[in-house]
């Protein structure tokens, strides 16, 4: 590990040196000297030098407006370069040689073999493996696409430099390219000038699919197959679909008025265009490869006599894909299509069947090695991506459907549906769902809001089955919320069943999830259409914002457990869909640990999870990184199903109930109960300024005039991360543990830490948050930006944070945070030297910004935005 960490430090040092050269060339020696002086003061300040700390405050407090942008950019860009070096290190050859991760698939199979696990059981579990990643456009990706591309190229350079047999000339060429890429990044504006549209966000998602996942999925499936062959002695079926990709980009309209039915349609067209483009590239290469003359009799009977039979089939596909590309290009350009639907590829099987025929014929003719080359990769891509590239989820908030049906009811004279009792709503909806006559009058003109809901349902009706993965209802609270969507889809003429997925988000809704689903399953019509399959989404963001991390975590666990038990009793196959984020306040945790902390049997039908914002890039942005992510997910799912975690003991449940109640009361007592909290929050964080950063297409607030309750969970967490108090991720948790320990239950808490993955993961997450928090920096925000009469709030919170850190250390029996993960502690320590100046500069810039908000110096505004993105890079998981 020491050698590996030394290489990482050397790479970071080299990238930093090249950044220094770039700054010197672009800005001059004086600016570079100022930046270097700030860096040294920050390093010495972190080492406990009080004079250096004061000098750092003085230097950043008196910095001129013309110097703030280059200084902010220098520290921000260094943190981006550090992220690149760290991301590369996880996939470097040195890393692979240094450690065989205990969390990898191969290590899991070794353990299963040692424990004499049933080969048949392992075989069955592997064939049921499903990892479905749902890419979302949550506005936490602060890095522009222009820069992401350069960062990927820098990563490739680091990979080339790892080869120890390079000549001096070869090394110099690579280093010059590195220097050029860093210079290109320096001379590129890191702040978007305009907010991206939902279509821009979708294009970003598809670019990531093209540049990373298109290579990663076949590579992962090869590795999975090799592992199965080595440990189980068999090859996996070619048609196995252990990885699926879905997307919310273009489909998630919850709180985003810019995602319209027309946008959804455009994104679906673009996805098909991009899929045709990618498959056309693959098929064109395959046509060059499959020059063999020998084929099976069955193949010849089906496709005719040809000198090069495989090329004949593949070239036909190439012609169809070319036509498909033209067809969707015409649609995207609002032109009349030049080709008809009968000439193009619209369904996966149109690609799969002829290529699988080629595959089987090659194997029958003794050419297995050729069959298992590019052709197998394409078959795997068809299984995973299909001709739509990804499936799309539609998401909308429950009251929008209620309002739409209420408007229809008023028009036809049946009263105000929104005021009906739940039983009456259900009875009406079931009656209408069972009726053959339409509910909506033909010549009726709905309001724009209701028209948008109905138009979205019509777009769904126009798609072939499987294009839309599911319809997610956010803030679902009742059985009628689910039945209402089914009715709207029926009225739009959707000719097949689409899974309608309730999303339970708040503490109360999670607690009521079992009751709501029981009511639904008791409806005969509903049981008839779902075919004994149900998906339920668990919300992490809003539940944590509503009740605090500890209470939300326990509510999520209990809800999942109750739903698993309910569906098992009824013989219904349950898929739990996890709405996790990158931060602790939104359910984020290292993937392996997070999955093993789920309730027993909750992963038996696979994993469906959102990958959000910047976490898409960190976990999936490079093919090798994505392969490692898939490996970790697969290993955790198989382990959870084959070596399940223990059921929590009754006394553990009792303790968790107590912790949940106490922590929720503490959290809500501060966030809801203190009248000064909202003004304190708005002053002590850059919450209001964040809305100026053109991150995503979705507004930061559901209600622009509302308070904290109307603020979305993502900017809520993002704002607290900026000032290093990290409040949503810990408030209430440590204090609750302390109270329970003081009641004499410390022994049970320690046993929970040692023997229950759910609880030990929560403690580990707290430790990670505490290691990134900083009470001194938080105090600087208060003293410079907050009215004195509100200082008490910050002082109380910081005291609580310090007490909580000691509580967690007492549980881990360590004297320092992250002692058992020293490389993470070292990474945080290194980042702090560069993040601290950005925090202190942000305080100064917020002060200047707020002094005269009507006449802000453009340099101040630009530099403020840079500090926001820089701190996000330093913290890694932003929202």
Curated annotation (Swiss-Prot):
One of its GO terms (biological process) is tricarboxylic acid cycle. Its EC number is 4.1.1.31. GO terms for molecular function: magnesium ion binding; phosphoenolpyruvate carboxylase activity. The keyword ATP-binding does not apply. It comes from the Bacteria. One of its GO terms (cellular component) is cytosol. The keyword Lyase applies. Keywords: Carbon dioxide fixation, Lyase, Magnesium. PROSITE patterns: PEPCASE_1, PEPCASE_2. It catalyses: oxaloacetate + phosphate = phosphoenolpyruvate + hydrogencarbonate. The active site is at 138, 545. InterPro entries: PEP_COase, PEP_COase_bac/pln-type, PEP_COase_Lys_AS, PEPCASE_His_AS, Pyrv/PenolPyrv_kinase-like_dom. Its cofactor is Mg(2+). Pfam families: PEPcase. Belongs to the PEPCase type 1 family. Forms oxaloacetate, a four-carbon dicarboxylic acid source for the tricarboxylic acid cycle. This is Phosphoenolpyruvate carboxylase. It comes from Haemophilus influenzae (strain 86-028NP). The gene is ppc.
């Amino acid at each position: 590990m020491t050698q590996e960490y030394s290489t990482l430090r050397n790479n970071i040092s080299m990238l930093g040196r090249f950044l220094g050269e770039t700054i010197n060339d672009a800005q001059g020696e004086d600016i570079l000297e100022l930046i270097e002086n700030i860096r040294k003061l920050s390093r010495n300040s972190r080492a406990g030098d009080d004079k250096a700390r004061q000098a750092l405050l003085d230097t950043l407090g008196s910095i001129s407006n013309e110097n703030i942008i280059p200084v902010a950019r220098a520290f921000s860009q260094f943190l981006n370069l550090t992220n690149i070096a760290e991301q590369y290190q996880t996939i470097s050859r040195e890393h692979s040689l240094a450690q065989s991760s205990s969390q990898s698939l191969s290590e899991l199979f070794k353990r299963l073999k040692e424990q004499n696990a049933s080969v048949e059981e392992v075989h069955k579990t592997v064939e049921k493996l499903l990892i479905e990643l749902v890419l979302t456009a949550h506005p936490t990706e602060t890095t522009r696409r222009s820069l992401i591309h350069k960062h990927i190229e820098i990563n490739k350079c680091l990979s080339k430099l790892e080869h120890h047999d390079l000549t001096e000339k070869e090394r110099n060429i690579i280093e010059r390219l590195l220097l050029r890429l860093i210079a290109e990044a320096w001379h590129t504006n890191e702040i978007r000038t305009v907010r991206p549209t939902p279509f821009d966000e979708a294009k970003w998602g598809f670019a990531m699919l093209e540049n990373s996942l298109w290579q990663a999925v076949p590579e992962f499936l090869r590795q999975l197959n090799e592992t199965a062959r080595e440990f189980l002695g068999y090859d996996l079926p070619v048609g196995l679909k252990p990885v699926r990709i879905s997307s919310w980009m273009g489909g998630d309209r919850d709180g985003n008025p810019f995602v319209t039915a027309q946008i959804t349609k455009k994104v679906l067209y673009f996805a098909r265009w991009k899929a045709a483009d990618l498959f056309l590239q693959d098929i064109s290469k395959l046509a060059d490869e499959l020059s063999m003359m020998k084929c099976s009799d069955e193949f010849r009977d089906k496709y005719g006599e040809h000198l090069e039979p495989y090329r004949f089939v593949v070239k036909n596909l190439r012609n169809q894909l070319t036509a498909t590309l033209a067809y969707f290009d015409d649609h995207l350009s609002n032109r009349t299509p030049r080709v008809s639907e009968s000439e193009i590829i619209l369904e996966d099987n149109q690609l799969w069947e002829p290529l699988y025929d080629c595959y089987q014929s090659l194997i029958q003719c003794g050419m297995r090695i050729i069959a298992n080359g590019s052709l197998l990769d394409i078959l795997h891509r068809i299984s995973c991506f299909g001709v739509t590239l990804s499936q799309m989820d539609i998401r909308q908030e429950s009251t929008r459907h209620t309002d739409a049906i209420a408007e229809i009811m008023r028009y036809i004279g049946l009263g105000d549906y929104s005021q009906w009792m739940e039983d009456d709503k259900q009875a009406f909806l079931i009656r209408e769902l069972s009726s053959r006559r339409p509910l909506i009058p033909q010549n009726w003109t709905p309001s724009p809001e209701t028209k948008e809901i109905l138009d979205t349902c019509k777009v769904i009706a126009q798609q072939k089955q499987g294009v839309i993965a599911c319809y997610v209802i956010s803030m679902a609270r009742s059985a009628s919320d689910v039945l209402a969507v089914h009715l709207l889809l029926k009225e739009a003429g959707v000719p097949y069943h689409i899974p309608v997925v309730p999303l339970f988000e708040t503490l109360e809704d999670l607690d009521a999830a079992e009751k709501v689903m029981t009511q639904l399953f008791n409806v005969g019509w509903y049981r008839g259409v779902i075919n004994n399959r149900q998906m339920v989404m668990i919300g992490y963001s809003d539940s944590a914002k509503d009740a605090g991390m500890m209470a939300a975590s326990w509510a999520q666990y209990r809800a999942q457990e109750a739903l698993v038990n309910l569906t098992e009793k009824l013989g219904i196959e349950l898929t739990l869909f996890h709405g996790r984020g990158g931060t602790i306040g939104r359910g984020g945790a290292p993937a392996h640990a997070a999955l093993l902390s789920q309730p027993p049997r909750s992963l038996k039908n696979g994993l469906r999870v959102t990958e959000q914002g910047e976490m898409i890039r960190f976990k999936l942005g490079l093919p090798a990184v994505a392969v490692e992510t898939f490996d970790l997910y697969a290993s955790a799912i198989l382990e959870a199903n084959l070596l399940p975690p223990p059921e929590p003991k009754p006394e553990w449940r009792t303790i968790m109930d107590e912790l949940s109640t106490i922590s929720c009361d503490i959290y809500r007592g501060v966030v809801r109960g203190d009248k000064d909290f909202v003004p304190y929050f708005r002053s002590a964080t850059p919450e209001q300024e964040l809305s100026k950063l053109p991150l995503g297409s979705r507004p930061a607030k559901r209600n622009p005039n509302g308070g904290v309750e109307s603020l979305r969970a993502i900017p809520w967490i993002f704002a607290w991360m900026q000032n290093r108090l990290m409040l949503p991720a810990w408030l209430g948790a440590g204090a609750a543990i302390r109270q329970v320990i003081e009641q004499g239950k410390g022994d049970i808490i320690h046993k929970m830490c040692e023997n229950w993955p759910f609880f030990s993961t929560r403690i580990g997450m707290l430790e990670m948050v505490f290691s990134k928090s900083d009470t001194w920096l938080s105090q600087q925000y208060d003293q410079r930006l907050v009215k004195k009469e509100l200082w008490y709030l910050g002082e109380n919170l910081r005291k609580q944070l310090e007490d909580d850190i000691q509580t967690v250390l007492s549980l881990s029996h360590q004297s320092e945070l992250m002692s058992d993960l020293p490389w993470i502690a070292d990474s945080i320590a290194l980042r702090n030297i560069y993040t601290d100046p950005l925090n202190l500069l942000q305080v100064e810039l917020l002060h200047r910004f707020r002094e005269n908000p009507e006449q802000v110096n453009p340099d101040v505004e630009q530099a403020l935005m840079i500090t926001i993105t820089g701190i996000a890079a330093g913290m890694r998981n932003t929202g």
